[in-house]
């Protein structure tokens, strides 16, 4: 029997990267999935964002594990669309136990040079979008009366400053405060809330030239190899970037009975990056 057998998880940013990895990992352990992603380009983001084809591939991989999945294209900035997506998913799958507020963007820029749209979009997606996710989804867990778990994807950036990431850092640090209040408010309903704080992870959000330039401003056209050389100095263990499944395994611990009394914590998976 899987560690989340028979449970249903709502996952944002599920079309690729960590979100897809979480969906597949939980499906491997017996969960059914409600998946959402924006599936269109976000104007301020300098790398290609997820597509409809990406979300369809997540569906294919979950269904290949003989688990059910309800997938919807929705923007975490749109509370109405999120609410409809989760309502439809619960209507088809019958319950909700787990919420993974994973959707996020990265738009590196110097603090005093970024424009207002870059700042606002970051906060709208990476901070307010998480509040909208839990606002849309967690009432279903409360109504179920079985307890449950919420995991919010923060970042090592919430714990350790990096230049050119003020908006990202502000959003990810804000998630810690949101998590702690939610953990306090939801504990009587046996709903646990935690943040997870990855270091660099080898996904499309990291593996792109704007991020390479963030790590290697000394190189005119940095490559992945240039990025990895710099990233090795961030993590104390000899690895430039983790794999998405490394984060998914930590998420699985937090949402399963293995973590049944873990709430209100900042769960770091950083290869020693914060040491």
Predicted regions mapped to residue ranges:
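Canonical Rossmann dinucleotide-binding motif of NAD(H)/NADP(H)-dependent dehydrogenases/reductases
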Residues: 2-38
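Substrate-binding pocket helix/loop in short-chain dehydrogenase/reductase
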Residues: 110-111, 115-123, 231
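Active-site helix of classical SDR
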Residues: 134, 171, 179
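Short C-terminal tail/terminal secondary-structure segment
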Residues: 160, 233, 238-239, 251-252, ...
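A conserved structural motif in NAD(P)-dependent oxidoreductases
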Residues: 224, 235-247
């Amino acid at each position: 029997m899987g560690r989340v057998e028979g449970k249903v998880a709502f996952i944002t940013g599920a079309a690729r990267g960590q979100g897809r990895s979480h969906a597949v990992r939980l499906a491997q352990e017996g969960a059914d999935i409600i998946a959402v992603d924006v599936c269109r380009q976000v104007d301020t983001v300098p790398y290609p964002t997820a597509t409809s084809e990406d979300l369809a591939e997540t569906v294919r991989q979950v269904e290949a594990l003989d688990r059910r999945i309800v997938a919807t294209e929705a923007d975490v900035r749109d509370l109405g669309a999120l609410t409809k997506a989760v309502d439809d998913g619960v209507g088809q799958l019958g319950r909700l136990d787990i919420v993974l507020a994973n959707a996020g963007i990265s738009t590196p820029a110097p603090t005093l040079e970024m424009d207002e749209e870059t700042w606002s979009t970051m906060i709208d997606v990476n901070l307010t979008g998480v509040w909208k996710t839990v606002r849309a989804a967690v009432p279903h867990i409360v109504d179920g009366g079985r307890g449950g778990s919420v995991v919010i994807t923060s970042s090592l950036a919430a714990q350790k400053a990096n230049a050119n990431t003020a908006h990202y850092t502000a959003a990810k640090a804000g998630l810690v405060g949101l998590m702690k209040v939610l953990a306090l408010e939801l504990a009587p309903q046996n709903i646990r809330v935690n943040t997870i704080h990855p270091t660099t992870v080898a996904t499309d959000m990291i593996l792109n030239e704007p991020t390479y330039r963030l790590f290697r401003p000394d190189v005119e056209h940095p490559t992945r190899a240039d990025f990895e050389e710099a990233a090795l100095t961030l993590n104390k263990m000899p690895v430039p970037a983790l794999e998405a499944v490394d984060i998914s395994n930590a998420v699985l611990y937090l949402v399963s009975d293995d973590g049944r009394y873990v709430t209100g914590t900042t769960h770091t998976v950083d290869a020693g990056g914060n040491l």
